[in-house]
């Protein structure tokens, strides 16, 4: 079993997300979104949690500061990129956030790649509401990080079965590999917990699992780990669950 560092990343990458908030109405504010995007990128790259204070409403500021501070403990050397993205089908403005860098955990150094997409609503240049639309991350340790592909769908239907795969692009042959998968709860994400992930022997080609979507619309957040002779690969992804009706 191993502690899963990636869950801290998931919850911190979702620092602009509060499950109690969702964007209600589209707003025409293209230039305002571009300005906010630039300011957010500057604030995230400043390394100061207080830099977000001018970007968010008073209600959101404490949550943002706490989550960013925790994130910086585990991932102190990262670079953020924030860009406006295409509006949602109902006209809501969106942002794409990407982060790259390195992290250390349990004596291993990880290369980090992660991204998320959020729908937002601004009021006088401040973030007041948001909705997480997509999220995924990849952490790889070792002098030569293992080339892998995260094959998990973005959207699935309620009640359907679907595959959660972490594919090794250059199979390891007879090498001993162990892997595991867990469904992260909202409570684990909000608390920025590091759950213990049980591992089992896997083939050299990666980890391949079939999972069940819930019967109600919403989302599922998956955490996957693969331990190989040269290091560790961890990945996360949020899957939207939509009604089949």
Residue ranges and their predicted role:
Residues 210-230:
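Short, aromatic- and glycine-rich surface loops/edge beta-strands on solvent-exposed regions
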């Amino acid at each position: 079993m191993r502690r899963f560092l990636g869950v801290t990343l998931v919850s911190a990458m979702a620092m602009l997300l509060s499950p109690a908030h969702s964007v209600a109405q589209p707003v025409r504010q293209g230039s305002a979104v571009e300005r906010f995007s630039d300011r957010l990128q500057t604030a995230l790259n400043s390394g100061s949690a207080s830099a977000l204070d001018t970007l968010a409403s008073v209600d959101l500021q404490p949550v943002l500061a706490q989550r960013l501070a925790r994130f910086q403990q585990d991932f102190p050397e990262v670079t953020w990129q924030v860009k406006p993205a295409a509006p949602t089908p109902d006209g809501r403005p969106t942002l794409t956030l990407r982060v790259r860098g390195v992290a250390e955990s349990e004596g291993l150094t990880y290369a980090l790649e992660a991204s998320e997409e959020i729908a937002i609503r601004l009021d006088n240049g401040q973030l007041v509401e948001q909705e997480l639309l997509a999220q995924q991350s990849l952490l790889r340790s070792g002098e030569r990080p293992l080339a892998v592909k995260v094959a998990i769908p973005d959207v699935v239907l309620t009640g359907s079965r679907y595959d959660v795969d972490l594919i090794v692009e250059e199979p390891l042959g007879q090498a001993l590999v162990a892997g595991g998968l867990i469904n992260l709860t909202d409570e684990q994400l909000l608390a920025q917990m590091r759950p213990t992930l049980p591992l089992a022997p896997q083939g050299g080609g990666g980890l391949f699992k079939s999972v069940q979507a819930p019967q109600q619309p919403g989302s599922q957040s998956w955490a996957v780990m693969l331990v190989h002779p040269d290091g560790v690969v961890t990945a996360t992804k949020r899957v939207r669950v939509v009604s089949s009706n």
